[in-house]
Regions:
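A transmembrane-helix-recognition feature enriched in membrane-embedded lipid enzymes
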Residues: 1-63, 115-119
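Soluble catalytic domains of membrane acyltransferases
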Residues: 57-167
Length: 169
């Protein structure tokens, strides 16, 4: 990814979150009130829009094949290699609705992003603590058992190599 595309991606990422702060607050109030339908409606509308916007701004095209093979009547666990910053927007734009993601704990410290991620159903994992990693995987399992799909990048970080990196979770 060129430095200009990376800069454009992060400007769009945070610009979108700032411009849609009111919507974030509305979703958080709905979550606090137990109104999961409103939270889901907001997440299902804004996360794909944000993802497609990133791809458009950075000149990335997306073609998805095989959506018909993804069950609509039960949750799935999507497991993928993590090659670039684009992996998340590509997945979130390409799938029919957003899914929770197992994410490194450092992302929980980024203002606004962490709040959207929590609404999305992300689980934050401490990669250097085996017990905490197991708890995070148990939390992700509970989400899937509750009927929501989930995304895991088992390498634990972006990896540029051609072969599969060491699995960290």
């Amino acid at each position: 990814m060129s430095i200009l595309r990376t800069i454009a991606m992060f400007i769009y990422l945070f610009g979108y979150m700032i411009l849609h702060y009111g919507i974030l607050r509305r979703a958080e109030r709905a979550a606090a009130a137990g109104d999961t339908a409103t939270v889901e409606q907001i997440v299902n509308q804004h996360i794909p829009r944000w993802s497609r916007g990133i791809l458009k701004v950075t000149g990335v095209s997306l073609s998805v094949e095989g959506l018909e093979n993804i069950p609509k009547d039960r949750p799935c666990v999507f497991v993928a290699n993590h090659r670039s910053y684009y992996d998340i927007p590509l997945l979130l734009a390409g799938l029919e609705k957003p899914h929770g993601i197992l994410a490194k704990e450092e992302l929980e410290k980024i203002p606004l992003l962490n709040r959207w991620m929590k609404l999305l159903g992300c689980v934050f994992v401490q990669r250097d603590d085996v017990r905490a990693s197991v708890r995070a995987l148990n939390d992700a399992t509970a989400i899937v058992e509750g009927g929501r799909s989930f995304v895991i990048f088992p390498e634990g970080t972006r990896y540029k190599g051609e072969e599969l990196s060491l699995i960290h979770i």
